[in-house]
Amino acid sequence: IAPIFWSKGLSWNTTDEAALKDAEAMVETLAKHIKTFNSYPVQDVASGSVILAQCWNGNARQAIDSSKNENLVFVYPEPKSELWLDSYHIPAGAKSLKAAHSWINYVLDPAVAAKETTYTGFLSPVAGIEAHLDPKVAADPLIFPPADAIKRGERTERNETYDRRVAILTKFKAAAAQ
């Protein structure tokens, strides 16, 4: 639902009641034009079963690389886009703390992170990764977004409207392709 807010010049973390009501109404209109919500759209994009997809940059790269369609392109949205990151967490009470720390230390090694980035197509925040990357991979804007794309990124805030925004998105997903 973030693009609804961004198209109106608002943050997707808005607390404006009128904007939230407007988004709720808008999802009813938009839902009939949405084929699916798919967290891993690589096959749908690569096969051509969808003509437009919103997906993570690494998934877009995988779809483009595996498709026979030479016209597939990825763009970083404007005026805003979601700034996303994955993180590792060790659950409280975990019995294998040593193994968990070993795994995290392993994947934070620049050489290992470079292999993971090359394979998945997702950017790694590990310092020193560049020295371990093929220059073609290091220059790929699908992996390493341009500075202006990162600057346009907006993080999700867990503010007082977070649950409401999640509910609007859930309603949107439920109404899609009906």
What are these regions (language model features)?
Residues Q43, P146-Q178:
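Conserved C-terminal helix/tail region of periplasmic/extracytoplasmic solute-binding proteins
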Residues E70-E82, P91-A94:
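Short beta-strand->loop
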